[in-house]
């Protein structure tokens, strides 16, 4: 059974979100229309504002409404001399939530994937290299995902960064805190053994 074209359009738009299938999209649309019209209107306004006003930081490429994000605008963060390279703005939030990093970021907005047409230019690596030349960078921390593409991207960036005489490090990978060994896959266990530290 078809509903009004506007309801169908709303369901189709919600289906475009990651992880939202047809049934979930229908439930969300009906909930907004049946019970939460104020929430729906607020969602529409927030979505419109974000799509119109949120862009990318000119320095690190994360999301911001300004030309520079608050982290890049902070002299204290820049003075650390450390840049952490991540794949997505969500990675910045995850690291910031930990509260253990006080440097700046560089967001790739993806990873190298020649089959998908994603090369160094699409990742903004010329801007990263410009930072290595002009900013007082002492260390580059590569925090790309532990995937084949993430590892290839990290190696490519490390090769590029070696020309600039900075310390290059890669975040550790292995058994999560609170994880039980019997549930950890063999690749993660191998990484954990290879990356072990002395006590």
UniProtKB/Swiss-Prot annotation:
GO MF assignments: DNA binding; zinc ion binding
Keyword terms, alphabetized: DNA damage, DNA recombination, DNA repair, Metal-binding, Zinc, Zinc-finger
Keyword match Zinc-finger: yes
Protein's GO biological process: DNA recombination; DNA repair
Gene3D superfamilies referenced in this protein's UniProt entry, alphabetically: 3.40.1360.10, 6.10.250.240, RecR Domain 1
Pfam families named among the record's database cross-references: RecR_C (PF21175), RecR_HhH (PF21176), RecR_ZnF (PF02132), Toprim_4 (PF13662)
Zinc fingers (C4-type) by residue: 57-72
Domain Toprim residue range list: 81-176
Cited function: May play a role in DNA repair. It seems to be involved in an RecBC-independent recombinational process of DNA repair. It may act with RecF and RecO.
Family note: Belongs to the RecR family.
Protein name listed in UniProt: Recombination protein RecR
